[in-house]
Amino acid sequence: MIIPWQQVDSETLDNLLEAFVLREGTDYGEHERSLTEKVADVRRQLVSGEAVLVWSELHETINIMPRGSFRAGAEEQQ
């Protein structure tokens, strides 16, 4: 289930974004980027709609994923 990021308390959203970035451990190439920059990138993706907050009832977890991946996963389950 998609959770509208606008309905999440700002401090909670900040914590979710930071935890996601730390968990992902994404390599940004030659130039290391700060945690703040990485969090800002993910926030921009949420705001633009490229990424969505997804609640898994099965696992009782929340995740951030590309909108296209969420739709593809939902279609596969139907």
UniProtKB/Swiss-Prot annotation:
Domain of life: Bacteria
Short name of any one Pfam family annotated for the protein: UPF0270
Record-stated family: Belongs to the UPF0270 family.
Protein's name in the database: UPF0270 protein YPO0179/y3960/YP_0178
Species name: Yersinia pestis
